[in-house]
C-alpha cells in the first residue's frame, strides 16, 4: 500500500477488541505478506502514525484514534477497498 493509504479497514469500538482482532489477523497477514497496523487510543500516536507511513495495508482501529490520525494527515481512506464495522 502507499504510505498513509491502507487498503482495508477494520473499525472496532474498543482497544480490547482491536487487540483481539489484531491477534486473529496476524497469522493470516504474515502468510500473505500484508502489513497490519493497530491504531487505538491510550497508546503513543507517533508509533501508530509511523506504521501508517510505512504502508500498512490493513488497519484495525478504534473510531477516536482513527479520526485523530486522519485529522493529522497521517491516514487517508480514499484507497480503502474493504471495510469491516464491528
What positions do the PLM features span?
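SF2 DExD/H RNA helicase N-terminal ATP-binding lobe
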Residues: 1-86
Amino acid at each position: 500500500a502507499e504510505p498513509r493509504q491502507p487498503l482495508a479497514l477494520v473499525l472496532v469500538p474498543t482497544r480490547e477488541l482491536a487487540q483481539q482482532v489484531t491477534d486473529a489477523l496476524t497469522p493470516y497477514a504474515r502468510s500473505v505478506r500484508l502489513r497490519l497496523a493497530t491504531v487505538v487510543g491510550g497508546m503513543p500516536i507517533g508509533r501508530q502514525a509511523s506504521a501508517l507511513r510505512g504502508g500498512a495495508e490493513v488497519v484495525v482501529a478504534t473510531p477516536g484514534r482513527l479520526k485523530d490520525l486522519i485529522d493529522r494527515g497521517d491516514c487517508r481512506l480514499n484507497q480503502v477497498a474493504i471495510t469491516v464495522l464491528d
